[in-house]
From Swiss-Prot:
UniProt organism field: Escherichia coli (strain K12)
Highest classification ranks of the organism: Bacteria, Pseudomonadati, Pseudomonadota, Gammaproteobacteria, Enterobacterales
Protein name: Putative hydrolase fragment YghX
Family matches, as InterPro entries: AB_hydrolase_fold, Dienelactn_hydro, Dienelactone_hydrolase-like
Gene3D superfamilies: alpha/beta hydrolase
Disordered: region residues: 91-117
Pfam name, any one: DLH
Example of a GO MF term: hydrolase activity
């Protein structure tokens, strides 16, 4: 897969909705937490792996826009994993409570994120 093909997977397009279900047998998806690198609490992330991995597997960090780890970004991570990559989608809103379930509220929360954390 080329970098250009990966960029096509990452373009936001809410009209497409869910393309790869959480329960797809070709992937293993889970929510994880890990410590903030600067010691400011935990970061929530969505980790998705191909169900059948052997040896070293390339990985992609799926970075959301200003709305948080919304369902579209989760679907992008699942598509990346289905293409054979490990995908990690961290929630950049973790320090302010995480994705609120609404894109407009997510944009508002993005303004409250302390960039030094």
């Amino acid at each position: 897969m080329t970098a250009l093909a990966l960029f096509d997977l990452l373009k936001p397009n809410y009209a497409l909705a869910t393309q790869v279900e959480f329960t797809d047998p070709e992937i293993v998806a889970e929510y994880i937490t890990y410590p903030s690198p600067n010691g400011h609490g935990e970061v929530r992330g969505y980790l998705v792996k191909p169900a059948k991995m052997s040896g070293k597997t390339p990985a992609v960090v799926v970075v959301h826009e200003n709305r948080g780890l919304n369902p579209y970004i989760e679907d992008v991570a699942r598509r990346v994993a289905k293409a054979g990559y490990i995908a990690l989608a961290p929630d950049g809103l973790s320090s302010v409570g995480g994705y609120p379930g609404n894109d407009d509220k997510g944009r508002e929360l993005q303004q409250q994120v302390d960039p030094t954390n």
